[in-house]
């Protein structure tokens, strides 16, 4: 591997962190509010509009089809992304994804904590048969030897299962049910100091790394500049299974160390879990739950309304018939009068013609 290539990877790694990671409050430096826990094992199918109590679109516009949620770049300055409103404190994230094809375009799955621990899957759009794995701890990007490269056939046209298995002892990346990489706590950067170990939310999205203004190493890593004439570039998220290994309603940092031992799991019912397990009821479900007496009342009320409408219609029909008969009688009288006038006119005309043996005006 050439030095130039390693430097390119290093620069790209830094850019990836900059482009994909941010935090609204860093508990390494300040006291932050607790994170909402997921606290359960659940599956999300992305073929309809997202529930904004669970998922937050952080940039751009997403579209939803029978196949899944689409993250699409159609022009410059676009990077559609979303993230979960919940956090998991160790667990499993099983994502079924098709990457976006196109030089310069990066598709990504990111688990990230408030103190910038990070676990990544990334696809560079020019290579549709490879996915990259990576990790960071506390935002540290001093080294560039953390990445892994894994073969995946037809990653842009076929859905594959990319699973992250994460505990305090080890981190595993799985592809279609086969283990691709293992990182232990002890083998991570800093002998565990920079091992991802604090509660993370989940982020999905695509972004253009191959754009003018980015470092040359970043552009080369991404496969060159983006050719927007070949747009759209689309990543598709079909479904996600998330298993939070802790139960509770919130995760709280008790100090500024960023260690997993410092995280307090606050007992209680997760509001996110409640939203998932008890979604708003449909009209049919609400109707099914009504007692028999209430249903009878609804039927009677509906019957009364129907009867009133029918009576109104009958009254209107009768009134219209009476009105029609009156109008018909008036028309008959008018017709008879006009016929009498015409008969008189014809008689006068004939009398004039017979008397004068020719045509004469009739007054």
UniProtKB/Swiss-Prot annotation:
Chitin binds at residues 122, 203, 207, 218. The GPI-like anchor contains a phosphoceramide lipid group. The anchor position has not been determined. GO terms for biological process: carbohydrate metabolic process. Disulfide bonds join 25-32. It is a lipid-anchor; GPI-anchor. GO terms for molecular function: hydrolase activity, hydrolyzing O-glycosyl compounds. It catalyses: Random endo-hydrolysis of N-acetyl-beta-D-glucosaminide (1->4)-beta-linkages in chitin and chitodextrins. It is found in: Cell membrane; Secreted, Cell wall. Keywords: Cell membrane, Cell wall, Cell wall biogenesis/degradation, Disulfide bond, Glycoprotein, Glycosidase, Glycosyltransferase, GPI-anchor, Hydrolase, Lipoprotein, Membrane, Secreted, Signal, Transferase, Transmembrane, Transmembrane helix. Belongs to the glycosyl hydrolase 16 family. CRH1 subfamily. This is Crh-like protein 3. The lineage of its organism: Eukaryota, Fungi, Dikarya, Ascomycota, Pezizomycotina.
